[in-house]
Curated annotation (Swiss-Prot):
Listed cofactors: Mg(2+); Mn(2+)
SMART domains documented for this protein: BRCT, LIGANc
Compositionally biased intervals (Low complexity): 241-253
InterPro entries: BRCT_dom (IPR001357), BRCT_dom_sf (IPR036420), DisA/LigA_HHH (IPR041663), DNA_ligase (IPR001679), DNA_ligase_AS (IPR018239), DNA_ligase_CS (IPR033136), DNAligase_adenylation (IPR013839), DNAligase_N (IPR013840)
Top-level lineage group: Bacteria
Molecular function via GO: DNA ligase (NAD+) activity; metal ion binding
Region (Disordered): 237-256
EC number(s) given by UniProt: 6.5.1.2
Binding-site list for Zn(2+): 467, 470, 486, 492
Family: Belongs to the NAD-dependent DNA ligase family. LigA subfamily.
Gene symbol of the encoding locus: ligA
Protein name (record): DNA ligase
Signal peptide: none
Active site residues according to the UniProt entry: 161 (n6-amp-lysine intermediate)
Amino acid sequence: MEDALIADEQLDRYPIGSDPWIDSLRDIDSDAMELDDLDVSKLNVEQAVRLWSRLSAWVEGDQVAYYVKDAPLSSDAAYDARMNCLKRLESEFPQLDTPQSPTHRVGGTFSNDFTAVRHPSQMMSLDDVFSFEELRAWYDGVRKDLEWPEDKLLPMTCEVKIDGLALNLIYRNGVLTQGLTRGDGVTGEDITMNVRTIHSIPTNLDGPEGDIPDMVEIRGEVFMRWDDFHKLNEANEDAGRPPFANPRNAAAGSLRQKDPRITAQRHLSFYAHGIGELVWGSGKPVDVADEVRNQSDAYTMYRKWGVPISPHNREVTDFDQILDMIEYYGEHRGDIEHALDGIVVKVDDLALQRRLGSTSRAPRWAIAYKYPPEEVNTKLLNIVVQVGRTGRVTPVAILNPVYVAGSTVSRTTLHNAYEVKRKGILIGDTVVVRKAGDVIPELVGPVIAKREGHEQDLREFVMPTRCPSCDTVLRYEKEGDKDLRCPNSESCPAQLAERVINLAARKAFDIEHLGDQSAVALTNPEDNRPDSVEAYAPGVREIVVEPGEEPAPYLAPSGLELPPIQEPVLTSEANLFDLEASDLRDVYVWREAQIIEVRRHVDSHGKERKVRHRLGGSGLWHREPAFWSGVKDAPLKKDANRKTVKDSEGNPEYEVKPDAVIVGHGRNGRPRIEEPTENTRKMLDEIEKAKHTDLSRVLVALSIRHVGPPTAFTLAKHFKTLDALADASAEELEQIDGIGAEIADSIATFFEEARMPGNWRGRVLEAWKAAGVGMSTHDEGLPQTLEGKSVVVTGTLEHFSRESAKEAIERRGGKASGSVSRKTDWVVVGANPGSKATKAEELGIPIIDEQQFDTLLATGDVQ
């Protein structure tokens, strides 16, 4: 979000691919994600060898941790990024491509806890792709290798990629004799006793004797259903044990128990997805293709034997159907019974599979399309408490920034102190962060294996008993609550700042340039004020050091005093609409001076480069104007041709805007001015425009507890005016579809309190009415031109913000979708569109511009 405050200077790591970048790589997720941007063709041999050595060591360590110890050290995203980079390095520098490379290994080694057993036939892995382009290249490559006619359909199967553990079941004469882990693909661990406790795995194959082979290897995946996973974690919590981070870890820990009785209690499940060696009555191995024509026939055979198959498998015949499968389960990842991380595509015909063959680790006839990672690992730097707009006091995890599921995550809520304890997290832990779809990021839990050797760096979180903003004693609202609250709703600076942030949100008044920092500057400008003059360093914005150096000690000048405490411009949201530029001129905020390390390196052209690296805060603070510029020269006035405008005497003229203040003159009489920043001007313009908004947005802006945008929309549609809503009783409100007793009581209580003499909520309502804020709905009788239609907006539109475009679609009965799929009816493309426009072209979805969008809103069509 844009903000009226001056943003910190952007500082970068070393240039990707440079020597210092290679040497500074760490085995953390944020560094691993940079590997995707590396152009390996620009590396020299020495650089490639160094990078390969670092990555291969980490990948080997990850393989042992994942496959042998069942205690992953890295997230799937980081592992995939490192493995993918190794493959690209080996392709560009063939001398690195040796049989010992981790890219040629199927999994890990095997542990000493179970007997090592050789698989009758190698248990292979799958190659991964991460984009439609890579998937298309594989698909086209398969057709080319098979010399498949362009006009002929190529049957394939699509299967959800279960996030579990690979298992090889060996049946002899229909009896389960062994269950083996994948291990390194050649040798696995014998966990037969534990496998026998999994109810979905038959100990005897069903069917007449002639239909059962002498020996068969059935490959599949052991997993834990979401319901069973949640029950297991609840049981762990009740017993005081830490919860599992995800179902895969839970399944792994359960399957490899030394005591099968524990495995039996964990309710594991199994789906078959492959076939290995097959021996029939003659006693001789028979190629599967001679007995079963295709992959789907094998699954039919399994079902007859009583072996479970995933109900999500599909048979497809073209690339578009593959995309349909990927898109569907991409949108419904959380709706099926187990965790999944991709879609597996296989050539269905087993004879064609044999023709295509395999590499040393993976078949060429199958590929795994991996969805963007929903889980990554990162460092928990701290836990702070945040006071919300309704007084709820929430612990917030401060994270080492990491990219997950489409965005960078640096903080996430921990809900309450009970939740912190339940998850078993300590400040300093490496933690798992999950972001499924568009939901708020969740801190799942700690990576326990990462604690070893770092115990001294870990500490427990302690929940405060007083409000960190106003020092009011915190309390529970009612018995049994887990959430502490600050009861000082009127005067708590943190609550006021959060309410201002809320009213500026897209779904409220949509004041884009009133961001978080501006809200704090308006309501609590002394936030971060240092406790003593020893930490006050006027004018010091950064402290530059050489690599390895510590900043020199700071000594405050003699006689220096902290400036007087400022009174906030806003003591209530009531006077928001009365703000003028002049009110903001003397608002200053506290900024911490940053420690900047300047690193030097020589680029590929022999030229010395400097890279500025932010090390963190220095503990020294200075003040900066929040909304106005500092004193500066007035700019020269320019004409349409960008030439300086001069007066009749030939002297240059200067640009002094009406809201600027001339504070003096420099050389040649040039005015010295102070003026609002452009962001400030935009913020004030947006505040003025917000007066003319719809009632539903006003209701969101009022921060009524339990009233979010959907409820506000329902209320505005039902009551039409604020006065009518304010007069409604809780009983009347509860009669409205979608308004439950708790919401109805909250709304009625809000307006009852607002009517009390002197109540601050009443003052807000009266002030907004006096300022001309709209208190009625705008859409009565609006034609439902887009009913049942799905519209995606991408890029910047001239006359619509993203939120107002979404609102325009929804008010006409349409669905404003955030992603493009085959169900999308139109994609509206503005300036600088993203990948959604490209995907729309690939899928043949109609693309329209803003003018056509106006027509669409009015008529329901673009003709």
